[in-house]
Curated annotation (Swiss-Prot):
It comes from Human herpesvirus 1 (strain F) (HHV-1). Phosphorylated. GO terms for cellular component: host cell nucleus. It is found in: Host nucleus. This is Nuclear phosphoprotein UL3. Keywords: Host nucleus, Phosphoprotein. The keyword Phosphoprotein applies. Residues 38-50 have a biased composition (Polar residues). Residues 38-89, 138-157 are annotated as: Disordered.
Length: 235
C-alpha cells in the first residue's frame, strides 16, 4: 500500500465530459489505495493527523507549491536494513526505493519543457544520490485539440484545455528531504515567461501551476539498475 504523506498542491479533477481526471483518480481506478488526511474542525491543515481514512483520491485542494507553509512527511513504519549514507538497498541487478514524488502540471502550453527541466536539474544536483525519474506521461480528454485559425471571435469562450502532464521521482527515504527541497528550488526558479497556461476563459497566463505529491511505500519498490540514476562512484 502506498500512503500520500505530503501534498503541496492538488491535481485538477475532471469537470463535465471534457474535464481532465486527476492522476490520483486514475491511479485509484487501477487499484491503488490511498490514505487521505482527515482534518477535523479546530485542527490546523498544516498538521498531519495521526488517523486517516482510506479513499480513492484527494478530496479537497491544498495550497500550491509556491505558497503556504511546507509540511514534511513522517518516516515510514518499516525500517529496512541498509546503510544511511550509501546507495539504496540492492537485490541483485535491482535497486530498492521506498519514497515516490509525483510532479504534475496542468494546461501547460510549453509541452514537456517544464518536467524535462526538472529531470535534468535533479540529475545534476542530486548526482551523489541514487534516484529514478520516469519520463513525462500525459492524460487528456476527448475534446478536439485543433481549431481553425480565427474560429473563436473576440469575447467568445475557447474550449477548456484538457492536458495534464506528470512525472515520478523515486528515492531513498533518508534522501527525501533533499529531493523535496531541490524540487522546490527548481520549480520556483523557472522563468515565468517561458511557460504559459490557458485558463478556463481561454486567456493565456505567464505561469504554469506545478503540484508535488509525496508518497511512502509500506513495501520496497525495486527497479532494475539500468533504469536508475546511480550515485556518483556507485558500482
Amino acid at each position: 500500500m502506498v500512503k500520500p504523506l505530503v501534498s503541496y498542491g492538488s491535481v485538477m479533477s475532471g469537470v463535465g465530459g471534457e474535464g481532465v481526471p486527476s492522476a490520483l483518480a486514475i491511479l485509484a481506478s487501477w487499484g491503488w489505495t490511498f490514505d487521505t488526511p482527515n482534518h477535523e474542525s479546530g485542527i490546523s491543515p498544516d498538521t498531519t493527523p495521526a488517523d486517516s481514512i482510506r479513499g480513492a483520491a484527494v478530496a479537497s485542494p491544498d495550497q500550491p507549491l509556491h505558497g503556504g507553509p511546507e509540511r514534511e512527511a513522517t518516516a515510514p513504519s518499516f525500517s529496512p536494513t541498509r546503510a544511511d549514507d550509501g546507495p539504496p538497498c540492492t537485490d541483485g541487478p535491482y535497486v530498492t526505493f521506498d519514497t515516490l514524488f509525483m510532479v504534475s502540471s496542468i494546461d501547460e502550453l510549453g509541452r514537456r519543457q517544464l518536467t524535462d527541466t526538472i529531470r535534468k536539474d535533479l540529475r545534476l544536483s542530486l548526482a551523489k544520490f541514487s534516484i529514478a525519474c520516469t519520463k513525462t506521461s500525459s492524460f487528456s480528454g476527448n475534446a478536439p485539440r485543433h481549431h481553425r485559425r480565427g474560429a473563436f471571435q473576440r469575447g467568445t469562450r475557447a474550449p477548456r484545455s484538457n492536458k495534464s502532464l506528470q512525472m515520478f521521482v523515486l528515492c531513498k527515504r533518508t534522501h527525501a528531504a533533499r529531493v523535496r527541497e531541490q524540487l522546490r528550488v527548481v520549480i520556483q526558479s523557472r522563468k515565468p515567461r517561458k511557460y504559459y497556461t490557458r485558463s478556463s476563459d481561454g486567456r493565456l497566463c505567464p505561469a504554469v501551476p506545478v503540484f508535488v505529491h509525496e508518497f511512502v511505500s509500506s513495501e520496497p519498490m525495486r527497479l532494475h539498475r539500468d533504469n536508475v540514476m546511480l550515485a556518483s562512484g556507485a558500482e
